[in-house]
Every structure is written in structure tokens, then in C-alpha cells.
Amino acid sequence: HEKKLGQLFCDDSAQQIIDMLVDECEGAGAELRLNTAVTDIRKTANGFTVHTDTQSGTHTITCQSLVIASGGLSIPKIGASRFGYDVAKQFGLPVTAVKPALVPLTFQHEFLHRCRALSGLSVDAEVRYGKTVFREGLLFTHRGLSGPSILQISSYWDEGQALEIDLLPDIDVTALLKARKSETPRQDVLTALADCLPRRLAADILDELSVSGRLADLPDKLLARTGQRINRWQVSPSGTEGYRTAEVTLGGVDVNALSSRTMEAKTQPGLFFIGEVVDVTGHLGGYNFQWAWSSGFVAGEAA
């Protein structure tokens, strides 16, 4: 189903994708070899020899074309490794620096304590890093911030730098509070903010700023400071949750070393790299799957 324009998700679970791929492999007559470690790859006059190790012993596979579809480093518990990068380097292909992407951001100290207190709370937010902006859900967690907007911006964020978050992207909070002060001066500032934000979040923000009481008793300068905190919240992540939870790996085999039509290595005929092992990273919503399908298709046609 389509969540947002261009974003496609499984109706049930990712098992549907696995089942589809297995069915397609069986229909094409592909042989699946599980629990097999590739120990060596050699170039020959007619293609490649691939040496493997299994519980039953060692084996050698010969082929004219070899497609590396080993993925990146994300989610190591399912077997992610540097295998594809090592193969690329073995055959002289450049590999760009890699790091976790589409990944939750972590924080330390007082900010982390506040995130833990708000854990599970989600809001629509606009997250900005430089000129890159995403507006989607933001989720407070016991490690920091997550949700689609945070995952998206993590692919662009550089460690040590700050992000700007707008917790009410459709509302000028300073103008709202000043208007409420004029219209309903006896209203409590928490009540005014809780009309727009989850009350727990509004209370936490006001506590952080040491702001409380009736709007009539609060100077405009303090209302402006509150509005700034909500519309232009500056946060400085300490890092990410790493490959353990990253949906993709940023970086990989340099695209300039591959044919854009076939994904074949320009300097190694018969050797192809596809999917996440290549330095191509898409947004949330099936784009990385689509890259895997598309690059795999053209490589398969050419191999």
C-alpha cells in the first residue's frame, strides 16, 4: 500500500517480500545454497572461481559472471558483513566511507533524561539539517529521537552538528501565545500550549524554560522564547543507534566504478555489484528495495 506519494509498504509483513523472492528463484531454476561461507574468489580466463566452505566440506564454483548482492552493514544479527566491500577492494574498485543511515539518533545527559520521560510520545514535526528538510512523525524514545523524520534526516546529518526541529510546523507559536494573551489573558500558558501539543510534551518544554502561570503575567519576551523553543528547537545528537537498528548503510562501492546501465565493474568484466553494497541510499518507503530490484534486474540481464 502507498503511505505517502511514492512510499510503498507491505500490507502484512516483510515475509511477503521473502516469499515472493523465493518463489521467483524457484521458478527461474536458481539453486539456493545456505550456510555457505565464501572463502576465496579468483579471476580466470573464462570468468571466476568461487571457493566455499560448508559443513560437508569445501567446494568450488565456476562461473562466467559474478554478481555481488551481499548488502551493507545494517542489522548484523541477520548476517551483515563487509564481504561485498572486501571483494570490491580485492578487484581494485574504490569503496566510499560507510556509516549507518535511516537510523534513530541518540543523546546524552539532561536531554536524554527528558527523552526518556517522554518515551513513546509521537508528534508531527519538521526536522532540518542545513538545506535538507523532512516533515513526518517524530518519536521520543528511551535512547533519544526516532520516527520517520529523524530516520530520514540521519542520512544527511554529520556527527557533532546540530539539528533544528519545528514541533508545530503549521503554527507560529510566538504569535499564537501573544494572541491568546490578548484574547484570554487569564488562561494558563500550559493550557494554551496543550491545545496544540500533547500536554506531557508542553509541560516538559515549559518546565525546561521555567515558564508557568497565566499568560497575562508573562512578558512577551518570555512568550517569544517559548515560541522559539517549539518552532526552532536546536538539538545536538551524540550519535546514532548504529548498524544494530539502521535500515540501510550509507556509502559502499563507488558508483563511478560501475556501469550505470549494467552495474558491471568497468575494470573487471563479468563482475557486478548491486543493491545496498553500492553507494546508493534512498529515502524511507521502499526506495532502497526498488534500487535493489532495479540494479539487480539490469545486472541479471547483462550477466
Predicted regions mapped to residue ranges:
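Conserved N-terminal/central alpha/beta ligand/cofactor-binding core
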Residues: 1-31, 36
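A glycine-rich dinucleotide-binding beta-alpha-beta segment and adjacent secondary-structure elements
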Residues: 34, 203-281
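A conserved short coil-to-beta-strand element within the FAD-binding core of flavoproteins
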Residues: 34-47
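Core beta-strand elements of the Rossmann-like FAD/NAD(P) dinucleotide-binding domain
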Residues: 55-65, 133-136
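Glycine-rich loop(s) and the adjacent beta-strand/alpha-helix scaffold that form part
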Residues: 65-111
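Glycine-rich phosphate/pyrophosphate-binding beta-alpha loops
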Residues: 75-76, 104, 141, 145-148, ...
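An active-site-proximal "capping" alpha-helix that borders the catalytic cofactor pocket
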Residues: 84-91, 290-303
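An anion/pyrophosphate-binding glycine-rich loop and adjacent beta-alpha core
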Residues: 93-99, 103-221
